[in-house]
């Protein structure tokens, strides 16, 4: 049974502006610790951040809370399996919170073009 769905669109140029204005502080706010090593290797960091931002926003919409404790950027990491399929990795606090709501699985799709990054999330209970 579907618990919730969420989607988000982000303009990488907007992210580039935030990076110019706030620098590394902005990236650290968006990324979980486990995403940092991949981020620093990016040739287009604004696209990398736009996709993560969109994915995390879409998750917050799917759970119906928006970004508020414990649904926070730092508690959510986007990872990829061996085939390249994206999935979420959650901090323990968020794992517990998700479990209390009966959410048993999630599905994440991320896409990007030159001027747009998008994410779609489905949560099941």
From Swiss-Prot:
Organism expressing this protein natively: Nitrosomonas eutropha (strain DSM 101675 / C91 / Nm57)
Role played: Transfers the 4'-phosphopantetheine moiety from coenzyme A to a Ser of acyl-carrier-protein.
UniProt keyword annotations, A-Z: Cytoplasm, Fatty acid biosynthesis, Fatty acid metabolism, Lipid biosynthesis, Lipid metabolism, Magnesium, Metal-binding, Transferase
Chief localisation class: cytoplasm
EC number: 2.7.8.7
Cofactor: Mg(2+)
NCBIfam families: acpS (TIGR00516), pantethn_trn (TIGR00556)
Record-level Gene Ontology MF annotations: holo-[acyl-carrier-protein] synthase activity; magnesium ion binding
Coiled coil: none
Family affiliation: Belongs to the P-Pant transferase superfamily. AcpS family.
Stated name of the protein: Holo-[acyl-carrier-protein] synthase
A biological process term (GO) from this entry: fatty acid biosynthetic process
Transmembrane segments: none
Catalytic activity: apo-[ACP] + CoA = holo-[ACP] + adenosine 3',5'-bisphosphate + H(+)
Residues binding Mg(2+): 8, 57
Record's keyword annotation contains GTP-binding: no
């Amino acid at each position: 049974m579907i618990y919730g769905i969420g989607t988000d669109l982000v303009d990488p140029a907007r992210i580039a502006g935030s990076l110019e204005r706030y620098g590394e502080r902005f990236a650290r706010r968006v990324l979980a610790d486990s995403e940092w090593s991949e981020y620093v290797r990016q040739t287009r960091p604004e696209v990398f951040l736009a996709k993560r931002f969109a994915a995390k926003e879409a998750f917050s919409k799917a759970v119906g809370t928006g970004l508020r404790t414990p649904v926070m950027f730092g508690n959510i990491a986007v990872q990829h399996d061996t085939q390249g399929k994206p999935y979420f990795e959650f901090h323990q606090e968020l794992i517990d919170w998700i479990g209390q709501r009966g959410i048993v699985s999630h599905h994440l799709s991320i896409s990007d073009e030159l001027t747009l990054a998008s994410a779609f999330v489905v949560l099941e209970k």
